[in-house]
Amino acid sequence: MKHVRFNIFRKAAFAGALLPYNIYINGEFVGTIKNGKTLNVDVPEADIYYLEDNSSFERNAVIINSNTIDYNILIKRAGGWRTDSYNEFYIDNDDTSDQLPSFHFDRFVNAVFNDSIDQLSPDEQVLALCLNFSYSIMDDIQEVLASSNLSYTIEALKTIGANRYVDLLTQVIDEYFHNVSLPLNDEQIEQMYDGINKANQLIWKNEGPAYDELHKAIVRHITEKLNNPNNIY
């Protein structure tokens, strides 16, 4: 398998100086960068490279394969002072640095909150449901079990190959909610506090490997199914 080299330099900055960046390329953790340092890493060649400074789907950059063996990436801290600071990704081309495009999640997040998922294409619906699940499951499983999209979410997780969470949800439903009509309503949530608490404990106990698999699966879905100018700019 052919590999390419990524040389990723984190420009020194005061904002967030003490926080290391966990770098992911195409969903795989490749290393950590401290303030003012460089990470050199070889990754398998791909048509698209999706870069992140964490695994929470907040900031990213996208590189289309340009048939080169070296990619020199610069991470700059932007914002801060009176606004939240965040990272921007640049690619060095000889004497210039060009900001990289990124995959934009706003349209998919808005579709969930505006209850308009059905207006998205099938592949977009899968992303919206899985993205919403990734946020909800980190807080409390009752958000997942009370969602009107519960059955669609499970199917979406199956579609992208997030099988650990599919198995965990199946186990939770079978063990704690097998005689309950889902999704849960407010009254059921109050009555089933113990079951919800036990379900949360089970999810949290297994969330490391399950979330890693989910993260990789979502990134793979993005790079394979949604890599078009409507989403990347």
Spans of features found by a protein language model:
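Short loop/turn and low-complexity linker motifs enriched in small/turn-promoting residues
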Residues: 1-100
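Extended, alpha-helix-rich binding/interface surfaces that flank or overlap catalytic cores
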Residues: 60-63, 95-152, 156-233
